[in-house]
Each structure stands twice: as C-alpha cells, then as structure tokens.
C-alpha cells in the first residue's frame, strides 16, 4: 500500500520538488521546511499590476482586512501553492463578506496544507490576532487527549441542558474543501468511511450519504442538532465550499447518536461527541477515545491527518487551527444574559456566546450556546477545563442574581506561553 507521502506526490505533481525535503518530515507531521515549500511554489502572470487588483476593504471588519496592506498584497498576489491555490482565493470570502459590526470574523480560508506556509506573511498575523496573541513564528502547539486529567465536569442540569465537544481533522495529501475537486472530495469520503467501518463497541455505527436522504430526513437531523445545515451561509458559498452539493457529503454516527462524524462540510471531517445533560467529563472521555481510534484506523490505511508543531491540526479556517476544538453547552441564563456585564464576563473567561441554534441564531427561552473562544496555543484538556470552570462561574452568577446578590467581573485569563 502506498504511504501518505507517495500518495501526496502522486496526487499533486507539483509537490515532487518537495521530495528533496525527505518523506520522513511529512510522515512525522513536521512542518515542511519553508525553503522546500518555496521551491514548489508557483508564480502566475497578471495582466494588471497588484495596485489595480487590490480589493476595497475600507468598510470591512474582519481579521484579513486588518492585516492585508497593498504592500503585502503585492508581494503575495502572484504566488501559488503547489496545487495552484492563490491569495485571491484565500481572501475572497472576506472580501465578499465585510463582517458584522460587532463580531470580527476571520475573513480568509486555506485551500490546502501549504497555504499556511506560502501565504504566511498574511496568515501569521491573522492567526496571532484571532488566537489571543499566539505567534506561530515562535510558539509551538500542544496536543493532550488524556481525559483523566479533567477536574469536576458535572454541571447542574437545572441550567445545563446538553454538552458537546467537537473538532475537525483533514486528510493529508488532499486539498481542503474550498479547493478540492470532485474526485478529491469523493476520495476523502472513501478514506473516512472505510476507516469508520472499523469502529467497535459503543462507537460502532453507520454512514448516511446526504444524496441518499430525503429532504425530511435531512431536516430532522438538522433540527435535532446532529447534522450540519444546508450550505446557505455566504461564508461557505463565497469560499467555494458549497460546490457540487450534496455530492460526497454525509454523516456517520454511532447507534446512540452520541459520537458523530460529519464528512466534507467546512472541513474534511468534524468529529463530535454529544449528549443531553451536564456530564461534560463523560462527553470528553468519549471524544478522546473515539478520536484516537479514528486516527489509528486512518493511519492503518496508509493515510494521516494534517498536523505540524506550530499550528497543530490544519483546518480550512484559521480560527480552527490547533486543537480545532469547541467544547460547548446549552445553558439557561435568563438573568445573567440580561446583565450589562455579561459580555465582559465572557470575554475575560475566554468564552464565546452563540444563539441556541448556533452562529447567527437567536437565543430561545434564554438558552445560549457557550463555548471556548480559543483553539490554538492551549491543549484539548486545557480548553475543556476552561469551559468547565467558566460555565460553572456563569451558573454561580445566575444563582447569585436569583438571590438578589451582586456579581463581579473576573480578571482576564492570561494566554500561556508555549
């Protein structure tokens, strides 16, 4: 069976130049040496100068727009990754979607693993802003999937209705969703579904292709928060991730629907552990156990996940680099949510608030989706513990307000150096 490096070379002729870097560096998950990536990086010829092509970002509120200057654009606009992915393709979703006045989005995506190296002059400062000061040029990311290290992890179920942990993983050697061809997307599905067939015990389940579901079946899974929504988000469509929908997309879940894998949405895969109630410790234990098993099954079939020591696990959006992890709860906070200090409390705890149905949805019956804001620079264990401690603080605030007592804004958490 061909190894991942030979698969990578056969899938991408332009990467044959990288063979000089040595297959071992890829197989071990070590970042490709910049000089090797540059050797395989292409240049494209333009009819007009960069100044004529520079996008109008004056009214934009996203990280890309904050860091893309005319000079940076001029230096990067003619470069391509070994698969032909360009700077303009990276930023198009941020150009087309200026952002929310109060929510600063990332505004750019990667088309392949090499994107983060070829266009590092723009991606690195965006990553640093989005990830609370994490500098990918000088810092290293830590992975820790030892669920036994979690303290507490049992929420008061009068407040917490459900608990969930998710991450994303990308198959090395295949383009990411914004850039992948139909054949690559189908190959992702084949590789992942074949590996998942090896899951046993409480993780055993089956795969459901979207193309084989009825509209009613799809909608029921969406309403039950098991399946990703249809690709109507302008962030997805502008980035090219809705192409050929629903070809090679689907959901795999175990028999209890407590361990799920999304295939070919925003990322090659999204791995999810979830259940009703407040037992976050059990949810995380299942997540770690299942994720380790999935990675082992992928590797046994001659493939591996995209990873390097600076950026952790490589995913489509820079916001999900590192762990790719979002640990969240649906929590009822009728009093705290109306307190003017609520946003600052969340900010200092490095927590993120979404509506009951996720991004860009309202809170129903004062139920919010609360999760970790950071993904990179802290391990999975650290982030889940941060959510446990932070949500318990929010619940304590809610209890105090119920009793007519005052609450306080906690001091901001400091980003650790790695």
From Swiss-Prot:
Post-translational modification Phosphoserine, affected residues: 152, 197, 233
EC number in record: 2.7.3.2
Superkingdom, taxonomy of origin: Eukaryota
Region (Cardiolipin-binding): 40-64
Membrane topology field: Peripheral membrane protein
Subunit structure of this chain's protein: Exists as an octamer composed of four MTCK homodimers.
Domain Phosphagen kinase N-terminal: 46-132
GO biological process: cerebellum development; digestive tract development; kidney development; negative regulation of apoptotic process; phosphocreatine biosynthetic process; skeletal muscle tissue development
This protein's UniProt keywords: ATP-binding, Kinase, Membrane, Mitochondrion, Mitochondrion inner membrane, Nucleotide-binding, Phosphoprotein, Transferase, Transit peptide
Gene name as annotated: Ckmt1
Compartment(s): Mitochondrion inner membrane
Coiled-coil segments: none
Protein family membership: Belongs to the ATP:guanido phosphotransferase family.
Reactions this protein catalyses: creatine + ATP = N-phosphocreatine + ADP + H(+)
Binding site for ATP: 162-166, 225, 270, 326, 354-359, 369
GO cellular component, one term: perikaryon
Family matches, as Pfam families: ATP-gua_Ptrans (PF00217), ATP-gua_PtransN (PF02807)
Name of the featured protein: Creatine kinase U-type, mitochondrial
Other information: Mitochondrial creatine kinase binds cardiolipin.
CDD domains in UniProt: creatine_kinase_like
Stretches assigned to the Phosphagen kinase C-terminal domain: 159-401
Tissue: In many tissues, with highest levels in brain gut and kidney. In the kidney localized primarily in the outer medulla in the thick ascending limb and distal convoluted tubule.
Stretch forming the transit peptide: 1-39
Protein role: Reversibly catalyzes the transfer of phosphate between ATP and various phosphogens (e.g. creatine phosphate). Creatine kinase isoenzymes play a central role in energy transduction in tissues with large, fluctuating energy demands, such as skeletal muscle, heart, brain and spermatozoa.
Cited PROSITE patterns: PHOSPHAGEN_KINASE, PHOSPHAGEN_KINASE_C, PHOSPHAGEN_KINASE_N
């Amino acid at each position: 069976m061909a190894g991942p490096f030979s698969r990578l070379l056969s899938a991408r002729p332009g990467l044959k130049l990288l063979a000089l870097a040595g297959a071992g560096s890829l197989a071990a998950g070590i970042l490709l040496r910049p000089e090797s990536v540059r050797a395989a990086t292409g240049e494209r010829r333009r009819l007009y100068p960069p100044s004529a092509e520079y996008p109008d970002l004056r009214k934009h509120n996203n990280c890309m727009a904050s860091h893309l200057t005319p000079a940076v654009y001029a230096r990067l606009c003619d470069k391509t990754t070994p698969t032909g992915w360009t700077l303009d393709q990276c930023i198009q979703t941020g150009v087309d979607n200026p952002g929310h006045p109060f929510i600063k989005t990332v505004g750019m995506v990667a088309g392949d693993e090499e994107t983060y190296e070829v266009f590092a002059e723009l991606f690195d400062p965006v990553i640093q802003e989005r990830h609370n000061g994490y500098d990918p040029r000088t810092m290293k990311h830590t992975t820790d999937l030892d669920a036994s290290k979690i303290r507490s992890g049992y929420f008061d179920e009068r407040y917490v209705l459900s608990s969930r942990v998710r991450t994303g993983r990308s198959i090395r050697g295949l383009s990411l969703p914004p850039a992948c061809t139909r054949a690559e997307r189908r190959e992702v599905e084949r590789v992942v579904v074949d590996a998942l067939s090896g899951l046993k015990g409480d993780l055993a389940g089956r795969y459901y292709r979207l193309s084989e579901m009825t509209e009613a079946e799809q909608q029921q899974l969406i309403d039950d928060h098991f399946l990703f929504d249809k690709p109507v988000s302008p962030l997805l469509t502008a980035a090219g991730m809705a192409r050929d929908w629903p070809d090679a997309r689907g959901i795999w879940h175990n028999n209890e629907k407590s361990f799920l894998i999304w295939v070919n949405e925003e990322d090659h895969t999204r791995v999810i552990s979830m259940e009703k109630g407040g037992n976050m410790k059990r949810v995380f234990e299942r997540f770690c156990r299942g994720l380790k098993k999935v990675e082992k099954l992928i590797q046994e079939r001659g493939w591996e996940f995209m990873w390097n020591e600076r950026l952790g696990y490589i995913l489509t959006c820079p916001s999900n680099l590192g762990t790719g992890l979002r640990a969240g709860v649906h929590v009822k906070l009728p009093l705290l949510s109306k307190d003017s200090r609520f946003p600052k409390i969340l900010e200092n705890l490095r927590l993120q608030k979404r509506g009951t149905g996720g991004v860009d949805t309202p809170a129903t019956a004062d139920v919010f989706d609360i999760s970790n804001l950071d993904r990179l620079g802290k391990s999975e264990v650290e982030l889940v513990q941060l959510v446990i401690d932070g949500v318990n603080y929010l619940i304590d605030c809610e209890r105090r307000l119920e009793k007519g007592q005052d609450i306080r804004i906690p001091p901001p958490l400091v980003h650790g150096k790695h």
